[in-house]
Amino acid sequence: MKQYLDLCQRIVEQGKWVENERTGKRCLTVINADLTYDVAKGEFPLVTTRKSFWKAAIAELLGYIRGYDNAADFRQLGTKSWDANANENAAWLTNPHRKGEDDMGLVYGAVGRNFPKVGGGSVDLLRQIVDDLKRGVDNRGEIYTFYHPGAFHMGCLRPCLHSHHFSLLDGTLYLNSTQRSADVPLGLNWNMIQCYTFLALMAQITGHQAGQAFHKIVNAHIYEDQLELMRDVQLKRTPFKAPTLKINPDIKSLEDLETWVTLADFEVEGYEYHPSIQYPFSV
């Protein structure tokens, strides 16, 4: 929690204003931030200086694992996070690749689970990683990525948290996640949860101990209409002790995650938090 608040304070004090063409808003921006989540010690990075809807963040992660490309599927899992980008993004609404209401196109897990190959066909990146790790293999390229510039025109949004690189060392599984852009008050709040949970799940289904998740953020920003709430409200609050995340031990395979796992299989214990803050969301 401290490292997140330190980043927020750094942006407020040292950030530079940048015009964002997609949203038409200014962003107070810094370049490069590195966050670490110790899954081995159970240090769940859940924001306590405002109420965080952790269930929706995990629901979104499950959708990425399953390769969903429709906002309705994400809603069924328990999150409305893709409703706006699927149905209110002006550029996407006029895109000939859009299939209709709730269609997100080729984004995130829909790319990673069906990564296009040169010359035709596709690769299921996550399946390859899980199969390798279950056999104790780390080929130094166990990367689940959603980043495919050749397919950007076929989706409603370029991926922000775009790559997850798993590494196995002496029986312990580590994760290096890379994020090109982070809406720090809103998106990063969820992304931290997702990096932690993804490593915990992958370690559990491949039979390894979980180590640390290392989270690299390139462009970290606060939108101009979020700044006052961050500076004058959230950063004035004293954080509570970090809670813990409990995952159903019966989750033992990728097939489990693809089929029967729901939010009921996750529980957060000891979560104390300050009142919620309604930060504006930019489409």
From Swiss-Prot:
Keywords: Cytoplasm, Methyltransferase, Nucleotide biosynthesis, Transferase
Matches recorded under Gene3D superfamilies: Thymidylate synthase/dCMP hydroxymethylase domain
Subcellular location: Cytoplasm
Pathway(s) it belongs to: Pyrimidine metabolism; dTTP biosynthesis
Residues annotated as binding (6R)-5,10-methylene-5,6,7,8-tetrahydrofolate: D183, S282
Annotated function: Catalyzes the reductive methylation of 2'-deoxyuridine-5'-monophosphate (dUMP) to 2'-deoxythymidine-5'-monophosphate (dTMP) while utilizing 5,10-methylenetetrahydrofolate (mTHF) as the methyl donor and reductant in the reaction, yielding dihydrofolate (DHF) as a by-product. This enzymatic reaction provides an intracellular de novo source of dTMP, an essential precursor for DNA biosynthesis.
Family the UniProt entry places it in: Belongs to the thymidylate synthase family. Bacterial-type ThyA subfamily.
Enzyme class: transferase
Tagged with keyword Cytoplasm: yes
Active site (record annotation): C160
UniProt-listed Pfam families: Thymidylat_synt
Enzyme nomenclature, EC number: 2.1.1.45
Transmembrane segments: none
SUPFAM superfamilies: Thymidylate synthase/dCMP hydroxymethylase
The name this protein goes by in its record: Thymidylate synthase
Organism expressing this protein natively: Glaesserella parasuis serovar 5 (strain SH0165)
Molecular-function annotations in GO: thymidylate synthase activity
Oligomeric and partner information: Homodimer.
Gene Ontology annotations of biological process type: dTMP biosynthetic process; dTTP biosynthetic process; methylation
Catalytic activity: dUMP + (6R)-5,10-methylene-5,6,7,8-tetrahydrofolate = 7,8-dihydrofolate + dTMP
Any one GO CC term of the record: cytosol
Chief localisation class: cytoplasm
Domain of life: Bacteria
UniProt binding sites for dUMP: R22, R180, S181, A182, D183, N191, H221, I222, Y223
